[in-house]
Amino acid sequence: MYYCVPRLATGLAIVLCCLLASSLPVKAATGPDADHWTFGGSAYLWAAGVEGTSAEGDDIDIPFTELLGSLEGGLMGTLAAQKDKWTVIADLLYLSIHEEDDTTGNLVGLPVELDVDVKLRGFVSTFGVAYRVIDVGGTSLDLLTGGRYFDLDVDFEAEFAAQKIEYSDSGHALDGIIGGQVLKSLGDRWYVSFYGDIGTGDSEVTWQVWPVAGYRLENLDVVAGYRHLKWETDDGDTFDDLSFSGPLLGVKFSF
């Protein structure tokens, strides 16, 4: 009779873990360093909200401010190695999230007031290899292939009517992706770019689009844009579809 409650908690945990997982493409090296390996990275604040549908048919609508309030700690970073037309990218994320809330659950079709405590520890990695196929007149096109992987542990606890529910679970998923990024320079400093990818594997389909405007400084780029990421699944255990959308602000740097 309690099956729907832990399943919904696991779905929420996956939502939180996937929110910040991302591939952050970094432009390939040019000029005199094109024959040598160079290294760079990216850091972003993505103010994304979450919308979707759970496996039970419930609507999911979580604003960015609510997700931020649940964060206990985390480590997030992206590194890229570039040589000539090739770029190797690895994005790593560790999150610890703790959410306590009074909510209404659905047990055997009846609404029940619940005191809910959810703890999540998650690891996400997005990785890939990109190759520059066009680089002419301030316009470039990179094609990418790679994957997304996540691993998470969830501890769920709920109390209602002097009874207590405890539930723990773990899981992982791996999807292959293909994608590309086009970049157009607007003079020496300004540029615009558009990144997109699509993939499948343990999920039915995952895809994203990511338009960005950037400004080049001496040792880093300042970028601003908008990102939309969506997953669809056919396993019926957690959610039917999820989308993550919101503005972003960040920097790209090299060393």
Annotate each predicted stretch with a short phrase.
Residues 24, 28-32, 83-85, 128-136, ...:
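Outer-membrane beta-barrel proteins
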Residues 33-39, 75, 84-86, 137-143, ...:
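Outer-envelope beta-barrel architecture signal
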Residues 41-43, 77-83, 127-131, 145-147, ...:
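Residues on the lipid-exposed face of transmembrane beta-strands in outer-membrane beta-barrel proteins
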Residues 49-72, 92-124, 150-173, 201, ...:
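Extracellular/periplasm-exposed beta-strand and loop segments of Gram-negative cell-envelope proteins
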Residues 1-36:
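Cleavable N-terminal export/targeting peptides
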Residues 44-46, 82, 93-95, 132, ...:
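Outer-membrane beta-barrel pore domains and translocons
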Residues 190-206, 228:
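Transmembrane beta-strand segments that form the barrel wall of outer-membrane beta-barrel proteins
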Residues 27-94:
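Short glycine/proline- and aromatic-enriched beta-strand/turn motifs that initiate or cap beta-hairpins
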